[in-house]
Amino acid sequence: MRKFILPLIASLAFATPALANDTRVEVRGGAIWSNGTTKATYGAAAGVDFDLAPMTFAGGEVSADKIDQSGTKLAYGATGRFGVKAGPLTKVFVAGGYTTEPCDLCEGSWHAGAGVEQSIMGPLYLKAEYRHFFTGSGIPDSNSVVGGVGMRF
């Protein structure tokens, strides 16, 4: 799967920023839980959003996240999102995509979730997001909640 994710990351990174209404980068951290176990998680993401209409947008992001546990590695993700502007400073969205395996014995998984971004000062924003990971292959699904801070360009 890495053969597909890395070219996608590169293509988004080199996409013409002038076409984007909202290019952003963020750092985030939170918790991920599965099967009665909760661990910390942290990472970073970069993405672009495009206005579809005055109050709706769609976009995509690439990410790298790490579960704070020995034996895990960076999990890379590609996510699409669609949302509404709930005012001049707030975005509410649903998201879905794919995340690579977070450990050598794990598998990559599809994910879906929802979140909110709130502008706080100039280009800075705060973000909260929930994701459900559809793990499959007899491995219990997992869930995460993260908060982050980002900057729009």
Question: Whereabouts are the PLM-identified features?
Answer:
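Gram-negative outer-membrane beta-barrel domains
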Residues: 17-153
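Cleavable N-terminal export/targeting peptides
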Residues: 1-24
